[in-house]
Swiss-Prot record:
This is Uncharacterized protein sll1783. Gene3D superfamilies: 3.30.70.100. Pfam families: ABM. GO terms for molecular function: catalytic activity. It comes from the Bacteria. It comes from Synechocystis sp. (strain ATCC 27184 / PCC 6803 / Kazusa). InterPro entries: ABM_dom, AI-2_Isomerase_LsrG, Dimeric_a/b-barrel. Residues 50-138 form the ABM domain. Belongs to the LsrG family.
Length: 147
């Protein structure tokens, strides 16, 4: 009878520990991985456009996998409140090279994008597909003029 008592205590402790881990994960995810409501409000702030230009060289045998991964986050990114433009191109002049060209309303909009789950998924999965580190530059538009 004593062994059964310890088993039930161990099960209860394991269950409690498991629930603690799950709840901790959910709290962490909601705080750090999901865009915060206050950040979403900042996106509506003043226009101060930010341009992101990325050049990505992919391993030849990973090209199709990279395209599929990229396509999973293009539409959600375009739907974000601060996204002005989001383009993904295959470079016609260099094999296995891709270009991203993004325009965001302001830095808060880009920061919001960086916190989305699909962006985190891309950052997590893409390194194994790349032939070399991605070349990504962020530009702040100082002035625009009509031609």
């Amino acid at each position: 009878m004593r062994a059964d008592f310890f088993l039930s205590d161990n099960r209860a402790a394991l269950l409690k520990r498991g629930l603690t881990i799950i709840l901790s994960f959910l709290v962490f995810t909601s705080i750090f991985l999901l865009p915060s409501p206050s950040l979403a409000e900042d996106v509506k702030g003043a226009d101060d456009p930010i341009v992101v230009a990325g050049n990505i060289k992919v391993k030849p045998d990973k090209k199709e996998e990279f395209i599929a991964l990229s396509q999973t986050f293009i539409e959600p990114s375009r739907s974000e409140p601060g996204c002005i433009s989001y383009s993904f191109y295959e470079d016609e002049t260099e094999d296995n090279s891709f270009l991203f060209f993004e325009v965001w309303r302001n830095r808060a909009a880009l920061d919001y994008h960086f916190q989305t789950p699909y962006f985190h998924e891309f950052v997590e999965k893409s390194p194994d597909l790349l032939a070399k580190p991605a070349e990504i530059k962020i530009y702040k538009i100082a002035e625009t003029q009509t031609l």
